[in-house]
Amino acid sequence: MIDLLPTKTLYLPDQPVLIEVRGDCPPGAVLTARHLGQTQAECEVGRGVADLGRLPVGGYGVELCDPDAAVLARTAVQVAADPRAVLRYGFVVDYRPGRDLTAVADNLRRLHLTGVQFYDWAYRHADLVGGGEVYDDALGQPVSLDTVRSLIELCHEVGASALGYAAVYAVGRQEWAKWEHDALLTASGEPYALGDFLFIVDPAAEDWIAHFTADVCTAVARVGFDGFHLDQYGYPKRARRADGTPVDVARSFVTTIEQVRAALPGSRLVFNNVNDFPTWASAAAPQDAVYIEVWPPHVGLEHLAQVATRARTEAAGKPVVIAAYQHVYDSAPAQSADRATALSMATLYSHGATQLLCGEADRILVDPYYVRNHTTEPSTAALLHRWYDFLVEHDELLTAPGITEVTGSFAGSYNDDIDVTYPDTGTPVGHSATPGAIWRRITQAGDRYVMHLINLAGQGDTLWDAPRNAPAEVGAGTLKIRRAGSEPPRVRVADPDRHPRLIDVEVTLDGDFAYAQLPAPHLWQLVLIDPSRATHP
Protein backbone atom coordinates (compact mmCIF):
# COMPACT_ATOMS: atom_id res chain seq x y z
CA MET A 1 0.00 0.00 0.00
CA ILE A 2 1.22 3.48 -0.91
CA ASP A 3 0.30 6.52 1.17
CA LEU A 4 0.69 10.17 0.15
CA LEU A 5 1.11 12.73 2.93
CA PRO A 6 1.55 16.45 2.26
CA THR A 7 4.21 17.93 4.52
CA LYS A 8 1.83 20.80 5.39
CA THR A 9 -1.88 21.06 6.07
CA LEU A 10 -1.86 24.30 4.04
CA TYR A 11 0.85 25.89 1.90
CA LEU A 12 1.71 29.55 1.39
CA PRO A 13 2.41 30.78 -2.15
CA ASP A 14 6.17 30.99 -1.52
CA GLN A 15 6.42 27.43 -0.16
CA PRO A 16 7.21 24.43 -2.36
CA VAL A 17 4.50 21.75 -2.25
CA LEU A 18 6.18 18.64 -0.87
CA ILE A 19 4.49 15.23 -0.75
CA GLU A 20 5.87 12.36 1.31
CA VAL A 21 5.51 9.05 -0.52
CA ARG A 22 5.29 6.07 1.81
CA GLY A 23 5.42 2.53 0.47
CA ASP A 24 6.95 0.83 -2.54
CA CYS A 25 6.58 3.01 -5.60
CA PRO A 26 7.02 1.32 -9.02
CA PRO A 27 9.67 2.67 -11.40
CA GLY A 28 8.36 5.44 -13.60
CA ALA A 29 5.51 6.44 -11.27
CA VAL A 30 4.36 10.03 -11.75
CA LEU A 31 2.87 12.43 -9.23
CA THR A 32 0.41 14.92 -10.75
CA ALA A 33 -1.25 17.98 -9.21
CA ARG A 34 -4.47 19.14 -10.84
CA HIS A 35 -6.49 22.29 -10.24
CA LEU A 36 -10.18 21.65 -10.94
CA GLY A 37 -9.13 18.67 -12.99
CA GLN A 38 -6.51 20.50 -15.08
CA THR A 39 -2.86 19.44 -14.77
CA GLN A 40 -0.69 22.08 -13.09
CA ALA A 41 2.47 20.20 -12.10
CA GLU A 42 3.95 16.72 -12.20
CA CYS A 43 7.12 14.91 -11.32
CA GLU A 44 8.51 11.38 -11.29
CA VAL A 45 8.81 9.93 -7.81
CA GLY A 46 10.25 7.09 -5.82
CA ARG A 47 10.30 6.59 -2.08
CA GLY A 48 10.75 9.74 0.02
CA VAL A 49 9.55 13.30 -0.57
CA ALA A 50 8.43 14.54 -3.98
CA ASP A 51 8.64 18.23 -4.86
CA LEU A 52 5.81 19.67 -6.96
CA GLY A 53 7.32 23.14 -6.76
CA ARG A 54 5.46 26.33 -5.94
CA LEU A 55 1.83 26.37 -7.02
CA PRO A 56 -0.61 29.27 -7.45
CA VAL A 57 -3.29 29.89 -4.84
CA GLY A 58 -5.99 27.22 -5.01
CA GLY A 59 -6.94 23.65 -4.18
CA TYR A 60 -5.30 20.71 -5.92
CA GLY A 61 -5.97 17.03 -6.24
CA VAL A 62 -2.74 15.04 -6.22
CA GLU A 63 -2.55 11.58 -7.80
CA LEU A 64 0.24 9.05 -7.99
CA CYS A 65 -0.05 6.91 -11.12
CA ASP A 66 1.99 4.02 -12.47
CA PRO A 67 3.36 4.08 -16.05
CA ASP A 68 0.02 2.66 -17.28
CA ALA A 69 -1.86 5.60 -15.70
CA ALA A 70 -3.45 3.46 -12.97
CA VAL A 71 -4.04 5.52 -9.83
CA LEU A 72 -1.97 4.18 -6.91
CA ALA A 73 -2.79 6.80 -4.27
CA ARG A 74 -4.43 10.21 -3.86
CA THR A 75 -4.22 13.24 -1.62
CA ALA A 76 -4.94 16.95 -1.91
CA VAL A 77 -3.22 20.22 -1.09
CA GLN A 78 -4.27 23.82 -0.77
CA VAL A 79 -2.23 26.96 -1.35
CA ALA A 80 -3.63 30.05 0.39
CA ALA A 81 -2.37 33.61 0.67
CA ASP A 82 -4.05 34.08 4.07
CA PRO A 83 -3.96 31.01 6.35
CA ARG A 84 -6.60 32.51 8.64
CA ALA A 85 -9.10 32.54 5.77
CA VAL A 86 -9.20 28.73 6.03
CA LEU A 87 -10.24 26.66 9.05
CA ARG A 88 -10.45 22.91 8.85
CA TYR A 89 -10.75 22.25 12.55
CA GLY A 90 -9.50 19.27 14.57
CA PHE A 91 -8.87 18.47 18.23
CA VAL A 92 -6.49 16.86 20.71
CA VAL A 93 -7.30 15.65 24.23
CA ASP A 94 -4.40 13.48 25.39
CA TYR A 95 -1.58 15.28 27.22
CA ARG A 96 -0.02 12.41 29.12
CA PRO A 97 3.72 12.73 29.75
CA GLY A 98 5.91 11.23 27.06
CA ARG A 99 3.20 10.13 24.61
CA ASP A 100 4.19 9.41 21.00
CA LEU A 101 2.87 12.15 18.72
CA THR A 102 3.83 10.71 15.32
CA ALA A 103 0.36 9.43 14.45
CA VAL A 104 -1.21 12.76 15.45
CA ALA A 105 1.03 14.57 12.98
CA ASP A 106 0.13 12.06 10.27
CA ASN A 107 -3.59 12.59 10.86
CA LEU A 108 -3.29 16.38 10.69
CA ARG A 109 -1.42 16.06 7.39
CA ARG A 110 -3.70 13.37 5.95
CA LEU A 111 -6.89 15.31 6.70
CA HIS A 112 -5.38 18.77 6.07
CA LEU A 113 -6.48 20.13 9.46
CA THR A 114 -5.40 23.77 9.69
CA GLY A 115 -6.52 24.47 13.26
CA VAL A 116 -6.39 22.26 16.35
CA GLN A 117 -8.45 22.77 19.51
CA PHE A 118 -6.53 21.76 22.64
CA TYR A 119 -9.52 20.57 24.61
CA ASP A 120 -9.28 20.59 28.43
CA TRP A 121 -5.54 21.22 28.56
CA ALA A 122 -5.85 23.71 31.45
CA TYR A 123 -5.43 23.18 35.19
CA ARG A 124 -8.80 24.69 36.08
CA HIS A 125 -11.41 26.67 34.15
CA ALA A 126 -10.80 29.79 36.27
CA ASP A 127 -7.06 29.18 36.70
CA LEU A 128 -5.61 28.02 33.40
CA VAL A 129 -1.94 27.66 34.31
CA GLY A 130 -1.97 27.42 38.10
CA GLY A 131 -1.18 23.72 38.32
CA GLY A 132 2.53 23.76 37.60
CA GLU A 133 4.09 21.65 34.87
CA VAL A 134 2.27 18.36 35.58
CA TYR A 135 -1.25 18.10 37.00
CA ASP A 136 -4.68 16.51 36.72
CA ASP A 137 -7.33 18.65 35.05
CA ALA A 138 -10.72 19.44 36.61
CA LEU A 139 -12.06 15.99 35.70
CA GLY A 140 -8.96 14.03 36.66
CA GLN A 141 -7.24 13.68 33.29
CA PRO A 142 -3.41 13.83 33.45
CA VAL A 143 -1.73 16.82 31.80
CA SER A 144 1.94 17.47 31.14
CA LEU A 145 2.65 20.94 29.80
CA ASP A 146 5.70 19.49 28.08
CA THR A 147 3.33 17.31 26.06
CA VAL A 148 1.09 20.31 25.35
CA ARG A 149 4.10 22.29 24.12
CA SER A 150 5.25 19.36 21.98
CA LEU A 151 1.80 19.18 20.38
CA ILE A 152 1.91 22.93 19.71
CA GLU A 153 5.33 22.53 18.08
CA LEU A 154 3.95 19.64 16.01
CA CYS A 155 1.08 21.85 14.81
CA HIS A 156 3.54 24.52 13.76
CA GLU A 157 5.69 22.01 11.89
CA VAL A 158 2.75 20.94 9.73
CA GLY A 159 1.28 24.42 9.32
CA ALA A 160 -1.65 24.27 11.75
CA SER A 161 -2.69 26.74 14.45
CA ALA A 162 -2.84 25.55 18.07
CA LEU A 163 -5.84 26.96 19.95
CA GLY A 164 -6.17 26.47 23.68
CA TYR A 165 -9.61 25.74 25.09
CA ALA A 166 -10.93 28.36 27.52
CA ALA A 167 -14.50 28.60 28.82
CA VAL A 168 -15.30 32.30 29.05
CA TYR A 169 -17.56 32.19 32.12
CA ALA A 170 -16.99 28.93 34.02
CA VAL A 171 -15.73 28.70 37.60
CA GLY A 172 -15.11 25.49 39.55
CA ARG A 173 -15.98 24.84 43.17
CA GLN A 174 -12.43 25.53 44.36
CA GLU A 175 -12.52 29.08 43.00
CA TRP A 176 -16.24 29.80 43.45
CA ALA A 177 -16.02 31.78 46.68
CA LYS A 178 -13.80 34.30 44.91
CA TRP A 179 -16.23 34.82 42.01
CA GLU A 180 -19.77 34.12 43.21
CA HIS A 181 -20.48 37.85 43.43
CA ASP A 182 -20.41 37.79 39.59
CA ALA A 183 -22.75 34.78 39.37
CA LEU A 184 -25.55 34.68 36.82
CA LEU A 185 -28.68 33.64 38.70
CA THR A 186 -31.87 31.83 37.79
CA ALA A 187 -35.22 33.42 38.58
CA SER A 188 -35.26 31.44 41.83
CA GLY A 189 -31.88 32.84 42.84
CA GLU A 190 -29.69 29.81 42.19
CA PRO A 191 -26.48 30.20 40.16
CA TYR A 192 -26.56 28.81 36.65
CA ALA A 193 -24.20 25.85 36.37
CA LEU A 194 -22.92 23.06 34.15
CA GLY A 195 -23.65 19.90 36.08
CA ASP A 196 -22.59 20.19 39.69
CA PHE A 197 -19.00 21.31 39.25
CA LEU A 198 -18.93 24.48 37.11
CA PHE A 199 -20.76 27.69 37.94
CA ILE A 200 -21.45 30.51 35.49
CA VAL A 201 -20.48 34.16 35.94
CA ASP A 202 -21.17 37.21 33.82
CA PRO A 203 -18.31 36.98 31.30
CA ALA A 204 -18.23 40.78 30.97
CA ALA A 205 -18.11 41.55 34.71
CA GLU A 206 -15.25 44.00 35.09
CA ASP A 207 -13.14 42.04 37.57
CA TRP A 208 -13.79 38.69 35.86
CA ILE A 209 -12.86 39.90 32.37
CA ALA A 210 -9.66 41.44 33.74
CA HIS A 211 -8.79 38.08 35.32
CA PHE A 212 -9.76 36.07 32.24
CA THR A 213 -7.77 38.16 29.77
CA ALA A 214 -4.72 38.07 32.06
CA ASP A 215 -5.09 34.27 32.31
CA VAL A 216 -5.14 33.70 28.54
CA CYS A 217 -2.21 36.08 28.07
CA THR A 218 -0.22 34.11 30.65
CA ALA A 219 -1.13 30.88 28.85
CA VAL A 220 0.23 32.26 25.57
CA ALA A 221 3.45 33.35 27.28
CA ARG A 222 4.01 30.13 29.23
CA VAL A 223 2.65 27.50 26.86
CA GLY A 224 2.81 29.04 23.39
CA PHE A 225 -0.72 28.85 22.00
CA ASP A 226 -1.54 30.65 18.75
CA GLY A 227 -4.93 31.64 20.09
CA PHE A 228 -7.99 30.33 21.89
CA HIS A 229 -11.20 28.42 21.42
CA LEU A 230 -13.57 30.50 23.56
CA ASP A 231 -16.32 28.25 24.87
CA GLN A 232 -19.74 28.70 26.47
CA TYR A 233 -22.66 26.36 27.16
CA GLY A 234 -25.58 28.01 25.37
CA TYR A 235 -27.28 29.38 28.49
CA PRO A 236 -28.46 31.58 30.03
CA LYS A 237 -29.53 34.10 27.42
CA ARG A 238 -30.62 36.69 29.96
CA ALA A 239 -30.13 36.64 33.71
CA ARG A 240 -29.37 38.79 36.73
CA ARG A 241 -26.08 39.01 38.52
CA ALA A 242 -25.87 38.44 42.25
CA ASP A 243 -26.02 42.22 42.76
CA GLY A 244 -29.27 42.43 40.76
CA THR A 245 -27.74 43.82 37.55
CA PRO A 246 -29.65 42.55 34.48
CA VAL A 247 -27.35 40.90 31.94
CA ASP A 248 -27.89 40.40 28.21
CA VAL A 249 -25.46 37.52 27.84
CA ALA A 250 -25.11 37.97 24.07
CA ARG A 251 -23.73 41.47 24.68
CA SER A 252 -21.46 40.13 27.40
CA PHE A 253 -20.03 37.57 24.96
CA VAL A 254 -19.27 40.26 22.40
CA THR A 255 -17.55 42.33 25.10
CA THR A 256 -15.52 39.27 26.08
CA ILE A 257 -14.35 38.64 22.51
CA GLU A 258 -13.45 42.32 22.12
CA GLN A 259 -11.47 42.33 25.36
CA VAL A 260 -9.58 39.14 24.53
CA ARG A 261 -8.77 40.52 21.08
CA ALA A 262 -7.46 43.74 22.64
CA ALA A 263 -5.26 41.71 24.97
CA LEU A 264 -4.08 39.33 22.21
CA PRO A 265 -4.20 41.33 18.98
CA GLY A 266 -2.21 38.81 16.96
CA SER A 267 -3.88 35.63 18.21
CA ARG A 268 -6.41 33.46 16.42
CA LEU A 269 -9.76 33.47 18.21
CA VAL A 270 -12.75 31.16 17.68
CA PHE A 271 -15.91 31.61 19.78
CA ASN A 272 -18.48 28.84 20.22
CA ASN A 273 -22.03 29.88 19.29
CA VAL A 274 -23.91 27.05 20.99
CA ASN A 275 -27.04 26.19 19.01
CA ASP A 276 -26.54 29.38 16.98
CA PHE A 277 -26.54 31.61 20.09
CA PRO A 278 -25.63 34.39 19.61
CA THR A 279 -24.27 34.18 16.04
CA TRP A 280 -26.20 37.30 15.03
CA ALA A 281 -24.22 39.29 17.59
CA SER A 282 -20.86 37.52 17.77
CA ALA A 283 -20.12 36.98 14.08
CA ALA A 284 -19.13 40.61 13.61
CA ALA A 285 -16.92 40.60 16.72
CA PRO A 286 -13.12 40.57 16.20
CA GLN A 287 -12.62 36.81 15.88
CA ASP A 288 -11.34 34.61 13.06
CA ALA A 289 -14.22 32.24 12.27
CA VAL A 290 -17.90 31.66 12.85
CA TYR A 291 -18.18 28.43 14.81
CA ILE A 292 -21.50 26.87 15.82
CA GLU A 293 -22.14 23.77 17.92
CA VAL A 294 -25.54 22.30 17.02
CA TRP A 295 -28.08 20.54 19.24
CA PRO A 296 -31.85 19.90 19.00
CA PRO A 297 -33.97 21.33 17.49
CA HIS A 298 -31.30 21.25 14.75
CA VAL A 299 -31.80 17.55 14.05
CA GLY A 300 -32.25 17.33 10.28
CA LEU A 301 -29.91 17.78 7.34
CA GLU A 302 -31.90 20.82 6.29
CA HIS A 303 -31.35 22.33 9.75
CA LEU A 304 -27.59 21.95 9.26
CA ALA A 305 -27.97 23.68 5.90
CA GLN A 306 -29.97 26.53 7.44
CA VAL A 307 -27.45 27.06 10.23
CA ALA A 308 -24.54 27.07 7.77
CA THR A 309 -26.33 29.45 5.41
CA ARG A 310 -27.19 31.92 8.18
CA ALA A 311 -23.64 31.74 9.48
CA ARG A 312 -22.16 32.53 6.07
CA THR A 313 -24.51 35.49 5.76
CA GLU A 314 -23.26 36.87 9.08
CA ALA A 315 -19.63 35.82 8.63
CA ALA A 316 -18.52 38.55 6.22
CA GLY A 317 -15.99 36.22 4.63
CA LYS A 318 -14.80 34.40 7.75
CA PRO A 319 -14.67 30.61 7.55
CA VAL A 320 -17.70 28.80 8.98
CA VAL A 321 -17.28 25.65 11.09
CA ILE A 322 -20.14 23.54 12.43
CA ALA A 323 -19.55 21.21 15.38
CA ALA A 324 -21.97 18.37 14.66
CA TYR A 325 -21.05 15.43 16.86
CA GLN A 326 -21.88 12.08 15.26
CA HIS A 327 -23.28 10.25 18.29
CA VAL A 328 -24.58 7.63 15.85
CA TYR A 329 -21.28 5.73 16.08
CA ASP A 330 -22.12 4.84 19.68
CA SER A 331 -25.27 2.96 18.67
CA ALA A 332 -24.98 1.84 15.03
CA PRO A 333 -22.59 -0.24 12.90
CA ALA A 334 -19.81 1.72 11.23
CA GLN A 335 -21.26 1.26 7.74
CA SER A 336 -24.59 2.95 8.49
CA ALA A 337 -22.93 5.54 10.75
CA ASP A 338 -20.45 6.34 7.97
CA ARG A 339 -23.35 7.12 5.65
CA ALA A 340 -24.78 9.50 8.25
CA THR A 341 -21.42 11.25 8.51
CA ALA A 342 -21.11 11.42 4.72
CA LEU A 343 -24.53 13.04 4.39
CA SER A 344 -23.66 15.52 7.16
CA MET A 345 -20.44 16.43 5.35
CA ALA A 346 -22.22 16.66 1.99
CA THR A 347 -24.77 19.05 3.50
CA LEU A 348 -22.21 21.25 5.23
CA TYR A 349 -19.64 21.31 2.43
CA SER A 350 -22.29 22.09 -0.20
CA HIS A 351 -23.49 24.99 1.97
CA GLY A 352 -20.03 26.47 2.45
CA ALA A 353 -19.15 25.18 5.93
CA THR A 354 -16.76 22.61 7.35
CA GLN A 355 -17.32 20.22 10.26
CA LEU A 356 -15.38 19.81 13.49
CA LEU A 357 -15.26 16.02 13.73
CA CYS A 358 -11.75 14.54 13.52
CA GLY A 359 -8.75 14.69 15.79
CA GLU A 360 -5.98 12.96 17.69
CA ALA A 361 -4.47 10.11 15.66
CA ASP A 362 -7.66 8.25 14.76
CA ARG A 363 -10.61 9.71 16.66
CA ILE A 364 -13.93 11.36 15.87
CA LEU A 365 -16.27 13.29 18.15
CA VAL A 366 -19.40 11.58 19.44
CA ASP A 367 -19.86 13.57 22.66
CA PRO A 368 -19.48 17.19 23.83
CA TYR A 369 -16.91 16.00 26.37
CA TYR A 370 -14.19 15.37 23.82
CA VAL A 371 -12.35 12.87 25.99
CA ARG A 372 -15.29 10.52 25.28
CA ASN A 373 -14.42 10.15 21.61
CA HIS A 374 -14.69 7.27 19.16
CA THR A 375 -11.83 5.33 17.57
CA THR A 376 -12.38 5.18 13.83
CA GLU A 377 -12.72 1.86 12.09
CA PRO A 378 -10.87 1.38 8.77
CA SER A 379 -14.01 2.16 6.74
CA THR A 380 -14.50 5.44 8.60
CA ALA A 381 -10.85 6.44 8.25
CA ALA A 382 -11.00 5.77 4.49
CA LEU A 383 -14.22 7.77 4.16
CA LEU A 384 -12.76 10.75 6.00
CA HIS A 385 -9.59 10.62 3.91
CA ARG A 386 -11.58 10.68 0.65
CA TRP A 387 -14.00 13.40 1.73
CA TYR A 388 -11.45 15.72 3.32
CA ASP A 389 -9.33 15.42 0.16
CA PHE A 390 -12.42 16.30 -1.87
CA LEU A 391 -13.11 19.34 0.31
CA VAL A 392 -9.56 20.64 -0.12
CA GLU A 393 -9.37 19.92 -3.85
CA HIS A 394 -12.64 21.78 -4.56
CA ASP A 395 -12.38 24.47 -1.88
CA GLU A 396 -13.01 27.38 -4.26
CA LEU A 397 -16.28 25.75 -5.38
CA LEU A 398 -17.44 25.03 -1.82
CA THR A 399 -16.29 27.45 0.88
CA ALA A 400 -15.02 30.54 -0.96
CA PRO A 401 -16.60 33.69 0.54
CA GLY A 402 -18.20 34.97 -2.68
CA ILE A 403 -20.27 31.88 -3.48
CA THR A 404 -23.98 32.70 -3.83
CA GLU A 405 -26.97 30.35 -3.85
CA VAL A 406 -29.12 30.72 -6.98
CA THR A 407 -31.31 27.60 -6.81
CA GLY A 408 -34.57 29.50 -6.52
CA SER A 409 -33.63 31.76 -9.42
CA PHE A 410 -32.42 29.09 -11.87
CA ALA A 411 -34.12 25.75 -11.15
CA GLY A 412 -37.71 24.63 -11.56
CA SER A 413 -40.22 24.88 -14.39
CA TYR A 414 -40.74 28.65 -14.11
CA ASN A 415 -37.04 29.49 -14.36
CA ASP A 416 -36.00 26.56 -16.57
CA ASP A 417 -32.35 27.68 -16.64
CA ILE A 418 -30.53 24.78 -14.98
CA ASP A 419 -32.05 21.56 -13.69
CA VAL A 420 -31.73 17.80 -13.59
CA THR A 421 -34.11 14.85 -13.93
CA TYR A 422 -33.73 11.10 -13.48
CA PRO A 423 -35.83 9.56 -16.26
CA ASP A 424 -34.81 5.93 -15.65
CA THR A 425 -36.31 5.80 -12.15
CA GLY A 426 -38.45 8.91 -11.91
CA THR A 427 -36.69 9.86 -8.68
CA PRO A 428 -37.99 13.27 -7.62
CA VAL A 429 -35.64 16.24 -7.41
CA GLY A 430 -36.30 18.87 -4.77
CA HIS A 431 -35.26 22.23 -3.38
CA SER A 432 -35.07 20.87 0.17
CA ALA A 433 -33.92 17.76 2.02
CA THR A 434 -36.72 15.26 1.36
CA PRO A 435 -36.63 11.50 2.04
CA GLY A 436 -36.65 9.49 -1.17
CA ALA A 437 -35.51 12.39 -3.36
CA ILE A 438 -32.42 14.06 -4.80
CA TRP A 439 -31.69 17.28 -2.92
CA ARG A 440 -30.56 19.78 -5.52
CA ARG A 441 -28.71 23.01 -4.75
CA ILE A 442 -27.21 25.43 -7.29
CA THR A 443 -24.62 28.06 -6.46
CA GLN A 444 -22.69 30.62 -8.46
CA ALA A 445 -18.92 30.70 -7.92
CA GLY A 446 -17.45 33.51 -9.98
CA ASP A 447 -18.76 33.02 -13.53
CA ARG A 448 -19.38 29.31 -13.00
CA TYR A 449 -22.35 27.42 -11.63
CA VAL A 450 -22.10 24.51 -9.23
CA MET A 451 -24.92 22.01 -8.81
CA HIS A 452 -24.89 19.83 -5.70
CA LEU A 453 -26.89 16.61 -5.86
CA ILE A 454 -27.34 14.86 -2.50
CA ASN A 455 -28.93 11.44 -2.82
CA LEU A 456 -31.62 10.88 -0.18
CA ALA A 457 -33.33 8.14 -2.18
CA GLY A 458 -33.65 5.10 0.03
CA GLN A 459 -33.84 7.11 3.27
CA GLY A 460 -36.92 7.15 5.47
CA ASP A 461 -36.08 10.48 7.10
CA THR A 462 -33.40 13.17 6.94
CA LEU A 463 -31.97 13.10 10.46
CA TRP A 464 -28.25 13.87 10.32
CA ASP A 465 -27.25 11.88 13.42
CA ALA A 466 -29.07 8.59 12.79
CA PRO A 467 -28.17 5.36 10.98
CA ARG A 468 -28.57 5.69 7.23
CA ASN A 469 -29.61 3.13 4.65
CA ALA A 470 -27.57 2.40 1.56
CA PRO A 471 -28.51 5.00 -1.06
CA ALA A 472 -30.95 3.81 -3.70
CA GLU A 473 -29.77 3.64 -7.29
CA VAL A 474 -31.45 6.46 -9.20
CA GLY A 475 -29.83 5.99 -12.58
CA ALA A 476 -28.18 8.54 -14.81
CA GLY A 477 -29.26 12.15 -14.59
CA THR A 478 -30.23 14.37 -17.50
CA LEU A 479 -28.87 17.87 -17.00
CA LYS A 480 -30.62 20.68 -18.88
CA ILE A 481 -28.96 24.09 -19.27
CA ARG A 482 -30.32 27.18 -21.01
CA ARG A 483 -27.62 28.32 -23.42
CA ALA A 484 -26.17 31.82 -23.04
CA GLY A 485 -24.81 32.07 -26.59
CA SER A 486 -23.48 30.07 -29.49
CA GLU A 487 -20.70 28.45 -27.45
CA PRO A 488 -21.68 25.18 -25.77
CA PRO A 489 -21.26 25.00 -22.00
CA ARG A 490 -18.65 22.80 -20.41
CA VAL A 491 -19.93 20.30 -17.82
CA ARG A 492 -17.76 18.36 -15.38
CA VAL A 493 -18.68 16.09 -12.50
CA ALA A 494 -16.95 14.79 -9.39
CA ASP A 495 -17.96 12.50 -6.51
CA PRO A 496 -15.87 11.92 -3.36
CA ASP A 497 -16.62 8.19 -3.42
CA ARG A 498 -16.67 7.28 -7.12
CA HIS A 499 -14.60 9.76 -9.15
CA PRO A 500 -13.06 12.46 -6.94
CA ARG A 501 -11.42 14.34 -9.80
CA LEU A 502 -13.56 16.53 -12.05
CA ILE A 503 -14.19 14.77 -15.38
CA ASP A 504 -15.88 16.12 -18.50
CA VAL A 505 -19.20 14.76 -19.68
CA GLU A 506 -20.50 15.04 -23.22
CA VAL A 507 -22.76 17.99 -23.99
CA THR A 508 -25.33 17.99 -26.80
CA LEU A 509 -27.19 21.02 -28.17
CA ASP A 510 -30.88 21.25 -28.97
CA GLY A 511 -32.16 24.71 -29.80
CA ASP A 512 -31.80 27.09 -26.87
CA PHE A 513 -30.74 24.32 -24.49
CA ALA A 514 -27.76 22.10 -23.86
CA TYR A 515 -28.03 18.62 -22.34
CA ALA A 516 -25.57 16.38 -20.55
CA GLN A 517 -25.88 12.84 -19.25
CA LEU A 518 -24.63 12.71 -15.65
CA PRO A 519 -23.31 9.54 -14.02
CA ALA A 520 -25.61 8.09 -11.38
CA PRO A 521 -24.90 9.80 -8.05
CA HIS A 522 -23.85 7.86 -4.97
CA LEU A 523 -24.30 10.07 -1.87
CA TRP A 524 -23.11 13.44 -3.19
CA GLN A 525 -22.27 14.57 -6.70
CA LEU A 526 -20.79 17.95 -7.62
CA VAL A 527 -21.53 19.27 -11.11
CA LEU A 528 -19.43 22.18 -12.40
CA ILE A 529 -20.97 24.17 -15.24
CA ASP A 530 -18.99 26.68 -17.29
CA PRO A 531 -21.57 28.57 -19.38
CA SER A 532 -19.07 28.94 -22.21
CA ARG A 533 -16.05 26.85 -23.17
CA ALA A 534 -14.51 30.07 -24.46
CA THR A 535 -14.32 31.32 -20.86
CA HIS A 536 -13.03 28.07 -19.33
CA PRO A 537 -11.73 25.83 -22.12
Language-model segments: what does each one mean?
Residues 232, 318-413:
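Aromatic/acidic polysaccharide-binding cleft in carbohydrate-active enzymes
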Residues 83, 93-98, 164-223:
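Active-site-adjacent "subsite" loops/lids of carbohydrate-active enzymes
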Residues 72-124:
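An acidic-aromatic substrate-binding cleft motif
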Residues 204-290, 295-306, 315:
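Active-site neighborhood of glycoside hydrolase catalytic domains
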Residues 122-171, 244-253:
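Aromatic-lined substrate-binding rim segments of carbohydrate-active enzymes
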Residues 86-99, 129-145, 194-210, 234, ...:
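The substrate-binding groove and active-site-proximal loops of carbohydrate-active enzymes
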